[in-house]
Amino acid sequence: MTHDKNCPCGSQKSYQDCCQALHLGLDSGAQLATSPEQLMRSRYCAFVLKNFDYIIKTHHAAYLDGLTLEQLQQGPHPEWLGLDVLSANDTTQPDGSKFGTVTFKAWYKMNGEIDAIYERSEFIFEQGRWFYTKGHQMHAKLPGRNDPCVCHSGKKFKQCCMKG
């Protein structure tokens, strides 16, 4: 990814000014996500860039359910179209533990069909950083023909991703 392209997470910043620092700084602890939303956006970006090591390392080990780096590398690998964050929050419990949720739609195309992962993701803050734990899937409705395109091009859906 070149510096002149916007980060896939939808922030409207360049990748270098956005998720790259999180992707490169995770192992050293130099740069960690400061909120569930930032972690979720950086994980979406990692899926787009096929940085599956980041996906595994930001997924809480107790919730992997057998998911491996090899499985992620094998695919399937859709063409990611865009991310819509619908809501995000985090709370601190009286005992000091932190939890968060992010509801989003991650639009993709696979085998010529457009669909979305529509999920309410759950996160936990442990060992000084946020981890993804699990997600609750919901059904995503495709936009109408005259609605804005899911890829955030500024075009109508019928003039953009719906065409091809």
Curated annotation (Swiss-Prot):
It comes from Shewanella sp. (strain MR-4). HAMAP family: UPF0225. This is UPF0225 protein Shewmr4_2054. It comes from the Bacteria. Belongs to the UPF0225 family.
